[in-house]
């Protein structure tokens, strides 16, 4: 009984800083290994003779794995506990990402990318499941904001520092650059055992599959899919939309502000975490504003277009954090990982499928705006779900 009590005792306030650092670093590696691929893609493609489809798969395949790997993550949490699952997942991610640096052909590159994506996918439900073990109830919202800040900073850092900073340091070698991003994750995985929370994870042998009878599994997942569809979709079709306006010269500015908006969203949530997280009214407002910005991108051009997609990105970032914070706040004890895994399974399946369906329609019609219309249509269908969310804690 004493061991079980120790396993649930949160760290004293003096130790919250190292816990926060570990959460931030783990969050960073939710996105860095995925988003270093786009800036390195031309170098990888030239050396390995990748087709355009395979070059795109360097980024899209790991995103698809975010949905596929949610269930293995939930299973691991139920058998190993959240901390050991997170450490294992980070090791899988680091080894898979490092294997990409050693790939000799397209096949080995795709296998390594899928393996890396599996590790990232297993990390996702492990982080929210770990929060109640490390933090007191009134710190759960802040803990979520911290690791989500790390994740969104990872998007900005991975895309922004790879070419101007790391490539010159490693003699323009994409292989060495990938290793430099990947291997430090093994140190973070080992450091997860430093917080003195007992020597073992408390594990349960209950059902690890999503509880489809719990309406929050689908409701949160489908709204999460709306946020992901908007962010990944607008990002994917940004160049096509600007080219259709004959303003492709604005693409660097558009991408900068689009990605910077996600960082700004994470900083806002660090400040507002306790006041906003778990509040249905905030979620409803963010979902509406996200769709408003998306709709504006269809109607406006030039810098007004950039303002609209930047608004959509900023609000999508807020909505992402608000939704991912819900399982630790509302799930029963021991059910956090299960609910999170179901949300990620649904959310990332939608986030992958809806923009792809929009792209197929845009290819058929020759109008890039039709891709955005598909995302907007899905968002309007998902919006009423925010009105029926039951966010009462179930402990």
Language-model segments: what does each one mean?
Residues 142, 146-194:
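Helix-loop-helix hairpin linking two adjacent transmembrane segments in secondary transporters
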Residues 79-89, 274-287:
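Cytoplasmic membrane-interface "Motif A"-like loop-to-helix N-cap segments
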Residues 38, 216-263:
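Extracytoplasmic gate region of multi-pass secondary transporters
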Residues 49, 81, 102-107, 299-301:
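Helix-breaking motifs and short loop linkers at transmembrane-helix boundaries and internal kinks
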Residues 330-367, 375:
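A late C-terminal transmembrane helix in Major Facilitator Superfamily
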Residues 279-323:
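C-terminal transmembrane helical hairpin of 12-TM major facilitator-type secondary transporters
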Residues 68-104:
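Conserved MFS/SLC helix-loop-helix module at the cytosolic interface between two early adjacent transmembrane helices
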Residues 112-149:
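Cytoplasmic helix-loop-helix junction between adjacent transmembrane helices
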């Amino acid at each position: 009984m004493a061991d079980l009590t120790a396993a649930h005792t949160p760290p004293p306030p003096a130790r919250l800083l190292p816990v926060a650092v570990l959460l931030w670093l783990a969050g960073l590696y939710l996105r860095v290994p995925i988003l270093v691929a786009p800036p390195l893609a031309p170098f990888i493609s030239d050396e390995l003779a990748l087709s355009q489809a395979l070059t795109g798969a360097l980024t899209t395949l790991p995103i698809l794995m975010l949905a596929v790997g949610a269930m293995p993550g939930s299973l691991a949490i139920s058998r190993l506990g959240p901390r050991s699952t997170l450490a294992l997942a980070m090791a899988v991610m680091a080894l898979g990402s490092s294997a990409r640096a050693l790939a000799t052909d397209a096949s080995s590159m795709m296998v390594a990318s899928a393996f890396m994506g599996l590790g990232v996918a297993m990390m996702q439900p492990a982080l929210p499941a770990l929060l109640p073990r490390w933090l007191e109830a009134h710190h759960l919202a802040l803990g979520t904001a911290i690791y989500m800040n790390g994740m969104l900073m990872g998007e900005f850092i991975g895309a922004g520092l790879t070419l101007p900073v790391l490539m010159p340091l490693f003699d323009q070698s994409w292989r060495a650059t990938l290793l430099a991003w990947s291997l430090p994750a093994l140190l973070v995985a080992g450091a997860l055992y430093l917080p003195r929370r007992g020597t073992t994870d408390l594990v349960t042998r209950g059902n690890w599959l999503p509880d489809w009878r719990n309406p929050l599994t689908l409701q949160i997942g489908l709204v999460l899919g709306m946020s992901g569809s908007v962010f990944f979709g607008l990002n994917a079709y940004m160049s096509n939309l600007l080219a259709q306006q004959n303003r492709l010269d604005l693409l660097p500015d558009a991408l900068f502000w689009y990605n910077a908006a996600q960082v700004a969203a994470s900083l806002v949530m660090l400040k507002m975490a306790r006041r906003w997280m778990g509040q249905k009214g905030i979620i409803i407002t963010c979902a509406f504003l996200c769709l408003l910005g998306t709709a504006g991108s269809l109607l406006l051009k030039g810098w007004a277009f950039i303002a609209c997609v930047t608004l959509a990105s900023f609000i999508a970032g807020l909505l992402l954090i608000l939704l991912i914070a819900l399982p630790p706040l509302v799930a029963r004890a021991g059910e956090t990982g299960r609910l999170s895994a179901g949300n990620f399974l649904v959310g990332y399946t939608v986030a992958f499928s809806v923009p792809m369906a929009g792209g197929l329609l845009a290819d058929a019609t020759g109008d890039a705006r039709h891709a955005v219309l598909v995302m907007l249509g899905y968002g309007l269908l998902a919006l009423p779900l925010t009105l029926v969310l039951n966010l009462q804690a179930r402990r």
